[in-house]
C-alpha cells in the first residue's frame, strides 16, 4: 500500500430533522490510514460494528486489483459492496466484482447500473406498443453515444456496455452489433443518444436534450417527446446514496 504510514480517526454526529420535533441521528466514525497502517483497518472496523445490523461498504473510486486479498478481508463482515464502475479503468475490475459476488457473502451494487434505470424505463416504454413489441427480435444494431468526463475511456464506456447487455438480454439474440461513441463533456459516462437499427432498415433514435430537459424518440422518421425522462435532472452519485 502506498502513502504515509499513519492512522487517524474522528467521530461526529449527524442529525436529520423530521416532521415536528423528531429527528434521526447517527454517529459517523472516520478512520484514515496510509502506508502499512491500512492493514489495521479491517480489525478496527469489525470492532466498531453493531452486531446484527446490516453493513455496507461504499468503495469510492477504482478497485485496487493488486490488493484483492486485503479488500476481501475488509468485505468479510459486509452485506453489500457499493461501487461506481464509471471510475473503473480496466475490464478486470468488472471480473473481480463478479468474483466477489460468486465467492463471498457480500452482494455488489453498482451505482452506474442504478443511473441507467431511467434509460431502461424509457426504452421499455417505447416497446410497449404492440407494433414495436413485434420488432423487438428484429434488432440488429445498437449505436450508443455517451459523454466522457473522466481519464478512463473504459469507465466512460461502462454505462453504454450495461445498456447494450440489457438490450441483448431482452431480445435473447446474439446477432446484435454494438458500437460505442464517447464525446467530451462533464457528465461522466452519461448516455446521450441510442440508435436502434432493425432488419429491413427501420430505425429508432432515443436522445436526451439537456438544455430543454426532455427526451425524444424518433420512430420511423416521426419524433415525439417521451413522458419518462432519462437523467434530465443530472442525478449524481451523491443523489443515489441514502445517508
Where are these regions (language model features)?
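An N-terminal, globular interaction/scaffold subdomain
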Residues: 1-67
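C-terminal structured domains
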Residues: 9-15, 149, 161-243
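Acidic, Ser/Thr-rich peripheral helices and adjacent loops at domain boundaries
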Residues: 14-18, 80-83, 100-107, 111, ...
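A broad structural signal for short, well-ordered beta-strand segments within beta-sheet-rich domains
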Residues: 25-26, 52-54, 77-79, 139, ...
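Gly/Ser/Thr-rich loops at beta-strand to alpha-helix junctions
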Residues: 37-38, 62-65, 88-90, 149-150, ...
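Short amphipathic alpha-helical segments and helix-helix/interface helices
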Residues: 45-46, 71-72, 164
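Contiguous mid-protein beta-loop-alpha structural module that forms a pocket-lining wall or clamp
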Residues: 52-133
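ATP/pyrophosphate-binding catalytic subdomain of soluble kinases
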Residues: 112-179
Amino acid at each position: 500500500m502506498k502513502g504515509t504510514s499513519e492512522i487517524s480517526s474522528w467521530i461526529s454526529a449527524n442529525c436529520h430533522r423530521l416532521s415536528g420535533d423528531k429527528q434521526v441521528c447517527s454517529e459517523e466514525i472516520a478512520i484514515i490510514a496510509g502506508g502499512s497502517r491500512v492493514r489495521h483497518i479491517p480489525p478496527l472496523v469489525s470492532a466498531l460494528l453493531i452486531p446484527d445490523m446490516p453493513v455496507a461498504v461504499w468503495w469510492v473510486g477504482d478497485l485496487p486489483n493488486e490488493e484483492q486479498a486485503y479488500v476481501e478481508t475488509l468485505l468479510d463482515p459486509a452485506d453489500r459492496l457499493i461501487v461506481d464502475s464509471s471510475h473503473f479503468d480496466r475490464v478486470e475490475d468488472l471480473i473481480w466484482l463478479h468474483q466477489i459476488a460468486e465467492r463471498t457473502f457480500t452482494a455488489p451494487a453498482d451505482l452506474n447500473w442504478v443511473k441507467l434505470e431511467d434509460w431502461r424505463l424509457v426504452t421499455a416504454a417505447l416497446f410497449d406498443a404492440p407494433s414495436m413489441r413485434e420488432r423487438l427480435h428484429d434488432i440488429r444494431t445498437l449505436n450508443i453515444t455517451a459523454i466522457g468526463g473522466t481519464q478512463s475511456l473504459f469507465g466512460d464506456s461502462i454505462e453504454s456496455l450495461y445498456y447494450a447487455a440489457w438490450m441483448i438480454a431482452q431480445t435473447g439474440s446474439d446477432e446484435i452489433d454494438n458500437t460505442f461513441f464517447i464525446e467530451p463533456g462533464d457528465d461522466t459516462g452519461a448516455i446521450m443518444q441510442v440508435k436502434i437499427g432493425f432488419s429491413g432498415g427501420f430505425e429508432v433514435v432515443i436522445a436526451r436534450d439537456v438544455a430543454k430537459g426532455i427526451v425524444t424518440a424518433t420512430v420511423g422518421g416521426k419524433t415525439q417527446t417521451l413522458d419518462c425522462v432519462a437523467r434530465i435532472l443530472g442525478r449524481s452519485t451523491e443523489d443515489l446514496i441514502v445517508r
